[in-house]
Amino acid sequence: MKDVVDSSVCKSNPEPDYDVAIVGFGPTGATLANLLTLRGLKVVVFERDKDVFQLPRAVHFDGECMRVFQAAGIAQTLLPNLFVGPGMKFVNARGELMIDWTRPGGIGPQGWCASYKFHQPDLERALRAQLCSRGGADVHLRHEVFALDERDDHVRIRFEDTAQGRLAHTTARYVVGCDGARSTVRRFIGTELADLKSHERWVVVDVLLEGERADLGDYSIQYCDPARPTTYTRGPHNRRRWEIMVMPGDDERRIGTPEWIWERLARWITPEHAQLERSAIYTFHSVIAQGWRRGRLLIAGDAAHQTPPFMGQGMAAGIRDASNLAWKLADVIHGALPDALLDTYESEREPHVRTFIETAVQLGGVIQATDSDAVAARDREMTAAIREFRTPQPRLGPGWHAGAAGGDIGPQPVFDDGSRLDDAVGYRFALIVDEALAQPAQDALTTAAQGARVAIVPATREPLRAWLAETGARAVLLRPDRYVGGVAHDALELEALLARAGVACALQRREAA
């Protein structure tokens, strides 16, 4: 990545210099940049750090995220450095099982496994390399945005090249803040954070094993011990993570030091068997911003919401944000759909992410309980009838979808020849239709622009036929983020569905030209 500023950004142009400016180049920002350039948008990214952030952060993503990475073009690159997680178990201080969250190990409905463990710097490097290879984005490292001035048709962005000590500016049609919990863009939007009342300090430790330690196991374990709640997680290859809750009475001068860490890991591992790679003290928050958009300014990822890590859905939520927002920005900028489409970003995503955060807070209540009476009651209840936990599958909130299946995530079959649906479709709308409606659907796409916008997929293979039957429809429109946009039961509804996808708008623009 070039760590430079093009002097042209200081010139006055009748058109904005960029379609979208992204502030922050972590997983959310890098995923968004990849998806936007797939749709042909001109993107600029500002990142205040000079390299991939090295402190321990996310270690898990799910099959839906892997599907987004597939769209971005990095899924196969990631696979060699992933570990398929079998699930998570919650045990009390006596080691008795309370909650069993076993994940299916095979290929699931999203065309990928349900749970992957990863090393975040590997993911970020893959996203950055793919973006560089594809082109279409200017990436400015060690550049910090400090002012945003929203105009009628663009945003003026002022920033500092911190390596050179130079100030400059550029313009973009929209700005998306993927700049973390202390987001500058969120401050300019002026939104408040709703507090879901879970804030605890934990020390997060990444360890590299010197040799095999099969006894540690492949399951993540939540040790719900009131004396010291602790989490163990296996990573890919020889990586392991422990998360250790800071307790009242801990010596503030020693918390997080190597000596303090090894004392608390002695139950499982010693310095003779592993080395500390990195550690950090975090406060696990649970908050949601009350406004994710103001005009041409938007926020995503930790800038919009923060969750305790007990479901492994913090980074995943940001990836879903990027997936939801990218196609909407592209369609608005290309003129296929109105600007009001961007209002559906928050209305769809906020209830969805709230479900995961509230569930994580509830699980955190089990893990972090320290009151002796409450812990005793918890242990009696949960060991008497072990809970089998299943991952929530919330629908999107109100927005750009309709019908009984609208707002559900669509499946991605893996066919007998090993191919996946999304690879055949590409990053665009997909209309899954029964064989009788396939030709009318194809006939409706009378221009190359329409054909490029919507892929017609006849349901000739059993997985697609079965899914149509399950929805009770003859056609289902999958959005580029693979959520269901709507369904059709006959030719008239099919025509309306295609018009909803912006096909009519695309035709009108072509005729107007």
Task: List the model feature ranges, each with a label.
Residues 16-18, 164-174:
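Core beta-strand elements of the Rossmann-like FAD/NAD(P) dinucleotide-binding domain
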Residues 29-30:
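N-terminal Rossmann-fold NAD(P) dinucleotide-binding loop
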Residues 37-57:
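Glycine-rich FAD pyrophosphate-binding loop
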Residues 80, 129, 154, 174, ...:
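Conserved FAD-binding catalytic core of PHBH/FMO-like flavoproteins
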Residues 141-155:
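A conserved short coil-to-beta-strand element within the FAD-binding core of flavoproteins
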Residues 225-371:
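Internal nucleotide-binding/catalytic subdomain
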